[in-house]
Amino acid sequence: MPMKTPEYESVNPLATEQLILQFPFFVMFTFLIPLYYMVSKLAEEKEGKSREGMKMMGLKDSSYFLSWFIFHLILMIIMAGLITAMCSINLFPNSNKLLIFLHMFFFGLSLFGFSLVVVSILPTVRSSATAATLVHLITYFLMFALKDPASPQGLKLSLSIFPNVAMAFGLYNLYDFEAN
């Protein structure tokens, strides 16, 4: 005689839904340390005038900026690959893995551009690293106001200039497509 218990489900749909609501928060924190590192190293080179010294020794500007871009490109490829591998297990099993990878990769590249903007505005290492970290956190919390269906579409679109807002909207849309 079989026992009167519900059939075992390997993935609880409610747990997956709660995880996807919190997943942009985890992604934001995953990229927080590389953002801090990028901003502090860029500001350190700006403050120490090492670029001017390298220019006097014959280094071209294109080589200098290309080295920074390639270094962070490799870092973002590794991070996007790891996040894609983790998402592919249970979170987005039906989605295209390349789409998830590209989403995380472009989010990382937008953070690189964000770090360049912060470093160009603020003069010291400490102020630029602190400001980048705070703005990174604050822009994520804008999502709580924008998740309201009554918020205007134009506001959502204009605040998507911040990398965290665009990343969170992309992940929510990806989950909506995954659920349907």
Placement of each model-derived feature along the sequence:
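Membrane-spanning alpha-helical segments of multipass transporters and channels
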Residues: 1-44, 50, 61-62, 66-180
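Short cytoplasmic-facing helical segments at TM-TM junctions of multi-pass membrane proteins
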Residues: 49-56
